[in-house]
């Protein structure tokens, strides 16, 4: 799609060469044939280092656009990006190609195997499983009944995916119009699970917008957990039931998230940190500490001291 067509579709004005755009991508990873966007001053610092051929940007940030990068100036770059994401979304089904199923793998009846799927030696795919196009499953995995693994997702060796979990569904991403409409952002990334990962029943892990949602090796995820788009979980994390991680949350290695805990988006939790049940992570947290509470979350010993003071206060009164 030419920049002039994109400008017409989004109501943007543009300066620079009317180049052909083949995909949308992040500022970090875009190339000369791709379009990116910047929705605020926080991300404007990344524009100079980007290789994007063009960028959706608001008028007040155009000074950050380097020479050689075309600027599509619009009132709401995030909304313009959402509108375009449908046009650049990957197709639901790709061109049919043969799949590579290892001889020692077991595929039970009623499992759907898409195009160009790979299933490693010794893996078991149970009844009712859906494997989308280009899915790769390693060796000795057990994929339990009714698991859904959407297109392009990668499952490492020795993984257990329990019944009804969903890997690689679209993330919960929308842009909003002035009249209150919510415009869907189509996600072109995927989910990558390392080795020895376990995903509990009815857990959902969303695909990234452009890149991968990453679950590193030896991480264990309980039932009924929601992991948002572009999250990154380090080695050996333990995620207890009903935890919810908002998009782009980053957990270091061996982080423990207690039951019904959660995180706001774009926060980082350091290695070996532990979040107590119902803890709410709203800011970056240091490595190796225990935390509790929600607003604000705090070190566990401080939380207990405050609870004791509250109890003494009510006993006196």
From Swiss-Prot:
Signal peptide: none
Domain of life: Bacteria
Molecular-function GO terms, alphabetical: N-acyltransferase activity
GO biological processes: lipid A biosynthetic process
GO CC aspect terms: membrane
Record's keyword terms, sorted: Acyltransferase, Lipid A biosynthesis, Lipid biosynthesis, Lipid metabolism, Repeat, Transferase
Pathway: Bacterial outer membrane biogenesis; LPS lipid A biosynthesis
EC numbers on record: 2.3.1.191
Catalytic center residues: 229 (proton acceptor)
Reactions catalysed, as given in the entry: a UDP-3-O-[(3R)-3-hydroxyacyl]-alpha-D-glucosamine + a (3R)-hydroxyacyl-[ACP] = a UDP-2-N,3-O-bis[(3R)-3-hydroxyacyl]-alpha-D-glucosamine + holo-[ACP] + H(+)
Keyword Hydrolase: no
UniProt record similarity statement: Belongs to the transferase hexapeptide repeat family. LpxD subfamily.
Alphabetical list of NCBIfam families matching this protein: lipid_A_lpxD, PRK00892.1
Quaternary context: Homotrimer.
PANTHER family to which the protein is assigned, alphabetical: UDP-3-O-ACYLGLUCOSAMINE N-ACYLTRANSFERASE, UDP-3-O-ACYLGLUCOSAMINE N-ACYLTRANSFERASE 1, MITOCHONDRIAL-RELATED
Reported function: Catalyzes the N-acylation of UDP-3-O-acylglucosamine using 3-hydroxyacyl-ACP as the acyl donor. Is involved in the biosynthesis of lipid A, a phosphorylated glycolipid that anchors the lipopolysaccharide to the outer membrane of the cell.
This protein's name: UDP-3-O-acylglucosamine N-acyltransferase
């Amino acid at each position: 799609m030419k920049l002039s067509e994109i400008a017409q579709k989004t109501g943007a004005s543009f300066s620079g060469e009317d180049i052909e755009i083949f995909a949308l991508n992040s500022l970090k990873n875009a190339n000369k044939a791709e379009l990116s966007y910047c929705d605020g001053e926080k991300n404007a610092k990344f524009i100079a280092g980007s290789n994007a051929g063009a960028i959706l940007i608001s008028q007040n940030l155009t000074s950050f656009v380097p020479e050689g990068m075309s600027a599509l100036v619009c009132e709401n770059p995030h909304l313009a990006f959402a509108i375009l994401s449908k046009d650049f979304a990957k197709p639901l089904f790709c061109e049919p190609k043969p799949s590579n199923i290892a001889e020692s793998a077991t595929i039970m009846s009623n499992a759907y195997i898409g195009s160009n799927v790979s299933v490693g030696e010794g893996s078991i795919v149970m009844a009712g499983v859906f494997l989308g196009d280009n899915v790769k499953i390693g060796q000795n995995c057990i994929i339990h009944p009714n698991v859904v693994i959407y297109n392009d997702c990668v499952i490492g060796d020795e993984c257990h995916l329990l019944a009804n979990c969903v890997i690689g569904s679209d993330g919960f991403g929308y842009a909003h119009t002035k009249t209150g409409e919510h415009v869907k952002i189509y996600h072109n990334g995927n989910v990558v699970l390392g080795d020895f990962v376990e995903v509990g029943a009815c857990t959902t892990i969303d695909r990234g917008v452009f890149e991968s949602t990453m679950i590193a090796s030896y991480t264990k995820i309980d039932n009924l957990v929601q992991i948002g788009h572009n999250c990154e979980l380090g080695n050996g994390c333990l995620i207890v039931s009903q935890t919810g991680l908002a998009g782009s949350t980053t957990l270091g290695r061996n982080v423990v998230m207690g039951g019904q805990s959660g995180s706001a988006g774009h926060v980082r939790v350091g290695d070996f940190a532990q979040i107590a049940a119902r803890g709410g992570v709203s800011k970056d947290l240091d490595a190796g500490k225990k935390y509790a509470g929600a607003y604000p979350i705090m070190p566990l010993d401080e939380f207990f001291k405050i609870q004791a003071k509250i109890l003494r206060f009510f006993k006196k009164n």
